[in-house]
Amino acid sequence: MGKEFQIKIDSLDLGQVLDGLRARQQSWKNTAIFLRDDYFPDDSFVCEQCSDPDEAEKIASHYERIIRSVEQQIDQQGGW
């Protein structure tokens, strides 16, 4: 694990950060589905630069861990 940071950010901005992280996570999940099943998950799907479905799934999982960590910290500070 790398160095930990404490960042102060407005709740609206934090919501935008989480939305962006969720979009990236979904994109990588969709890439894993496409690479594994040769199936387009939705009409706006754009495949990430990856050729290994396991790697794409690991990247999606990494985004999920980041999102979960941020959400836990929000909860620890009293929620939205």
Summary of predicted features, one role per range:
Residues 1-80:
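Positively charged, low-complexity terminal tracts
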